[in-house]
Amino acid sequence: MEAIMLQKNKRNFSIIAHIDHGKSTIADRLLEYTGTVSERDMKEQILDSMDLEREKGITIKAQAVTLFYKAKNGEEYELNLIDTPGHVDFIYEVSRSLAACEGALLVVDAAQGVEAQTLANVYLAIENNLEILPIINKIDLPAAEPEKVKREIEDIIGLPADDAVLASAKNGIGIEDILEAIVHRIPAPNYDEDAPLKALIFDSYFDDYRGVITYVKVLDGNIKKGDKIKIWSTEKELEVLEAGIFSPTMKSTDILSTGSVGYIITGVKTIHDTRVGDTITSVKNPALFPLAGFKPAQSMVFAGVYPLFTDDYEELREALEKLQLNDASLTFVPETSIALGFGFRCGFLGLLHMEIIVERLRREYNIDLISTTPSVEYKVSIDNQEEKVIDNPCEFPDPGRGKITIQEPYIRGKVIVPKEYVGNVMELCQEKRGIFISMDYLDETRSMLSYELPLAEIVIDFYDKLKSRTKGYASFEYELSEYKISNLVKVDILVSGKPVDAFSFIAHNDNAFHRGKAICQKLSEVIPRQQFEIPIQAALGSKIIARETIKAYRKNVIAKCYGGDITRKKKLLEKQKEGKKRMKSIGNVEIPQEAFVSVLKLND
């Protein structure tokens, strides 16, 4: 049946929504209604297969699933749902999944309305010329205002919302209406069945037994089991060992016809051969041009990831390679730290992405890790000479080498917030060195603030602070803007007079003292006391800007002296003093793992 389904009866669509607006629940109901998943196998968030996805209530990996639906007009349709993430960090996952669709369901919470993150994904869908169907979800909530949300969709996004589908995925209301809207309003794929094969790779993951499983959308031609295919960028030739669809588990069909979405297995053992966004064509009859318009993933946040036990270094590298297989946006290169030993400098899309990767390394691969404070990429030049890009404070040039010019990346951010919290948001953006651009009133209760902000200020704790200052009501999205010259300095943290490279950070001159002092204070609380005094200092070049001292243990050496000559006691105290001095000069301070973790979690 799948092999002979006509293009006019196929629909490829995605679901766009802000976190918590009910995207995964709608996907669950569609699977249930079309009988793709039996009641026995049904569980919440069925497409969110990772435990982490369920715990955090978010979608991290793109997933594809094929549904078969008999419409009211009596015809059978093949509906390919590509479930995409909704968080700002995973915008690349969204962009490549949207390229495999002709339409998108825009899910908006009837009580919360349009959020900033929804906007970012909708604009991506519009860029890809997708037909967008507005769906107002959670209409059963007491606070639901569907008519107001319709006006918002029209005013803020500029989409007509008269025929928006009203639904409550939780209670199964409006699911049939959604399916009928998909069939009648999303266009069918319109490709050439007789042209040379052209297929888009929109995701891939590594299976321990079968190698790389590649998610593809067939545009022109078709892919059959036994075909010889070629990957465009690497010119690597492969044989298709299996082709099929996700329903929602893998189901072999031996052929993927024009306009279909499914998977192929070619026995490839590394994802570097099947890069996301690449084009597949036939060896016998190749296409003339590859598919255009894919942006490669760009790492925005960098951090060192080190195994707690040096024996785990190789294991960590293998784990990162496997994760990179499923995640084109993760980058890593080996690096060495005096304090932490051998590890990797990893590039992430954002802080949530970093948190998820580190958590997956701990859970799925049982590796105990230490991760350093995240930083961004700076452009540095000395005496206006050649520009160098650095993402690690250790690479920061020495202030004595000449006139240093540093440029840092800025983002253009939009915050949608209830009007009673506008003051709090403006205050936060000013603290984070933001440049005010504009303020628009979306309706009588909400405003949209636009700011330019340094990316470095965003990656640490901006999102958490924004949520706490607006009681969780604000939503935020951003895009990279440009590099600007800033007055930045490198601050070293010295423990017992020795710099600990893992604690070094780059900060704006105005914030260097506060952040340095906060780290010193935190370390003085978590580093255990020793037999000798431990100074903890923050240094800007050779200038100490903050200091905390961990007092030494004092052994009562004169406890055994009962009465007697005072000189005897003095002699013992002098001997103790000498011993402590010698201990201090040769003693090594053991820095516990909690110290690294507490500095990472430290909020300004």
Swiss-Prot record:
What membrane topology does the UniProt entry give?
Answer: Peripheral membrane protein
User: An example Gene Ontology cellular component term from the record?
Assistant: plasma membrane
First-tier enzyme category under EC? hydrolase
Write down the chemical reaction(s) this protein catalyses: GTP + H2O = GDP + phosphate + H(+)
Entry keywords, A to Z? Cell inner membrane, Cell membrane, GTP-binding, Hydrolase, Membrane, Nucleotide-binding, Protein biosynthesis
Question: What's a single GO BP term from this record?
Answer: positive regulation of translation
Matches recorded under SUPFAM superfamilies: EF-G C-terminal domain-like (SSF54980), P-loop containing nucleoside triphosphate hydrolases (SSF52540)
Residues of the tr-type G domain: 8-190
PANTHER family per UniProt: TRANSLATION FACTOR GUF1 HOMOLOG, CHLOROPLASTIC, TRANSLATION FACTOR GUF1-RELATED
Q: What is this protein called?
A: Elongation factor 4
Native organism = Fusobacterium nucleatum subsp. nucleatum (strain ATCC 25586 / DSM 15643 / BCRC 10681 / CIP 101130 / JCM 8532 / KCTC 2640 / LMG 13131 / VPI 4355)
The record lists the lineage as:
Bacteria, Fusobacteriati, Fusobacteriota, Fusobacteriia, Fusobacteriales
